[in-house]
A protein has these predicted regions:
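Transmembrane alpha-helices and adjacent helix-loop boundaries
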Residues: 1-233
Length: 233
């Protein structure tokens, strides 16, 4: 009886794991996972930034409704948000929405809610004297926030941003539930076709997820060190 792991199924399907059916068909696998992650990262960064600024707004008519929405979204499982976007977006827009964009919308909304709390904490961590000094030079409150407080706060937010972004990269695996052919979905398809190599297949995709997350973490650490070096100068 043969023992040990046999990764031949991985090497046989390596192209499918990496890019799906592209170029003869739609992209999939690792390429689609990166696409979902990068687009969602961009949207959630700016979404979280806007929501975070609204959470610290002086007007209670802006601050309280924003906090209510953010806390509501944070209290809902991501899987439910994906299902809601999958069924609601086509109804609201009146046309068919690609499954990948329903997932991007769900990931962006969900992560933006968590990002907003990071932004809020980062802004509130800056000494109030910074704002007062900026206002004393004649800057308006909004300009003081954008040009003085926020740049300092973002440097302090980077580690928390990275943790949230890495979590979101792993959360792209939930896209398989609505039929998006990202890495987990592709691995499930290959496993269902072969039926005898589940350990090898899912060990392989675990390594791929680790490499993606490690690469992003290393890049962010380099960026953090770069910003710290420039600040020291």
């Amino acid at each position: 009886m043969e023992t040990g792991l046999d990764f031949s199924v991985v090497w046989t399907n390596i192209t499918y794991f990496m890019i799906g059916r592209y170029p003869s068909g739609p992209i999939g696998g690792v390429l689609l996972t990166l696409y979902l992650a990068v687009i969602s990262l961009i949207f959630s960064f700016f979404g979280g930034l806007i929501l975070g600024l609204m959470c610290v707004a002086k007007s209670r008519y802006i601050r309280y409704p924003t906090l209510a929405v953010v806390n509501a979204v944070r209290g809902i499982p991501l899987l439910m948000v994906i299902f809601w976007m999958y069924f609601l977006l086509p109804f609201v827009m009146g046309k068919i929405v690609p499954e990948s964009w329903t997932v991007i919308t769900a990931l962006s909304l969900f992560t933006s809610a968590y990002m907003s709390q990071i932004v809020q904490a980062g802004i509130e961590g800056i000494p109030r004297g910074q704002t007062e000094a900026a206002l004393s030079t004649g800057l308006r409150p909004w300009h003081a926030m954008v040009f003085v407080v926020l740049p300092q706060a973002i440097r302090n937010m980077i580690p928390s941003f990275v943790n949230q972004f890495v979590s979101m990269i792993k959360d792209t695996s939930l896209a398989f539930i609505v039929g998006v052919s990202e890495l987990t979905h592709v691995a499930t398809q290959v496993n269902n076709r072969t039926m005898i190599y589940p350990a090898e297949i899912f060990l392989f995709i675990a390594v791929i997820y680790f490499i993606i997350c490690f690469a992003f973490t290393s890049l962010s650490r380099w960026l953090e060190q770069r910003l710290a070096w420039r600040k020291a100068i």
